[in-house]
């Protein structure tokens, strides 16, 4: 906020708005050129979520035509009475998290990139649930699945051209194992906590090299697990060790 105020004070609103529009147009043009370097076609991927009651499918087809990329979730299972569902805009965000590092690593990350993408997400499904569908754990549920599918179809598309084949990657951090604990501590007080150890993440293998054991996730290449001392200070837990398994 203070930095924006200082920019307005130095350059004025008209100049900042003009520069902002220019940056959006620049990003749009650059991603258009990048998409046109890639072959037209349709790439598909699907994942299943194992929940009480069965396996539930999320289906994605990505169709690239000239400089437009359409994501189509037709075939995805209906929403559930469980909190893993996504609203439309959560799905949109999960799709774009891999788009920026995989397609736009050298392009300013702003709204201009999104202008060439289309989303088909049938209402009432896991990726576009109707209110009042529960969505409290969407981030570790369908958001993660959509993120994975986006990585898969983009990597298949990149793998279809010699120029960008080496940028294709397997899924990073394929699932969030969200472990929730509650009970009584040594003083008889109720506690509840969420363990984020699985958030350490892992890097998927590339076309020419192995993956990495601990590497965060593709839109955020940093491990985000809470440190052991913090968990021990606030919960009746003691860590004996932390190590990859």
Residue spans of the language-model regions?
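Glycine/proline-enriched, intrinsically flexible loops and inter-domain linkers
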Residues: 1-245
